[in-house]
Amino acid sequence: MFNIKMTISVLLIALIVLLIIILVVFLYYKKQQPPKKVCKVDKDCGSGEHCVRGSCSSLSCLDAVKTDKRNIKIDSKISSCEFTPNFYRFTDTAADEQQEFGKTRRPIKITPSPSESHSPQEVCERYCSWGTDDCTGWEYEGNEKEGTCYIYNNPHHPVLKYGKDHVIALPRNHKHA
């Protein structure tokens, strides 16, 4: 009986020592990691990195969106996006108009100037970039020559779904993330 109690005591002490060693190694490893580089734009980061929520990161665009827009819901058919200087840009994607974010969709009349070489889609993006901080996303439906621009102004987290011939963009590092 005495040997069993002694064996259990030794095992408990060994387990506690092992846990302490693991904790010390973990804390040492955390201290050795270099701090993440602080950034405001992608140019502040190294090659292959993008500015995501104020830190340089090598996340894919889709993972960066999920980090930046914490409660975003993305249809499983949507497998990628593209970083632009101010937006996460999705092709063949639309906002779900039944959700809070999608209900704020309002059309904007786009008339590209004949003297400028910007497509209606680029004008739509510029409208959201130059507008107020209330622009929480833009969507373009149509082709390169003509289509409709929609602006969103609801800070609720978007629900994105597959939408043929739609392009939607969500602001990066936005105050409503």
Swiss-Prot record:
Localisation per UniProt entry: Virion membrane; Host cell membrane
Q: Which residues lie on this side of the membrane: Virion surface?
A: 29-177
**Induction (free text):** Expressed in the late phase of the viral replicative cycle.
What is one GO cellular-component annotation here?
Answer: virion membrane
Intravirion face: residue ranges? 1-7
- All disulfide bonds of the chain are none
Q: TM spans, by residue?
A: 8-28
User: What is the membrane topology listed in the Swiss-Prot or TrEMBL record?
Assistant: Single-pass membrane protein
Ordered alphabetically, the record's keywords are: Early protein, Host cell membrane, Host membrane, Membrane, Transmembrane, Transmembrane helix, Virion
Name the family: Belongs to the asfivirus inner membrane protein p22 family.
- This one is known as Inner membrane protein p22
The record lists the organism as African swine fever virus (isolate Tick/South Africa/Pretoriuskop Pr4/1996) (ASFV)
Its taxonomic placement starts with: Viruses, Varidnaviria, Bamfordvirae, Nucleocytoviricota, Pokkesviricetes
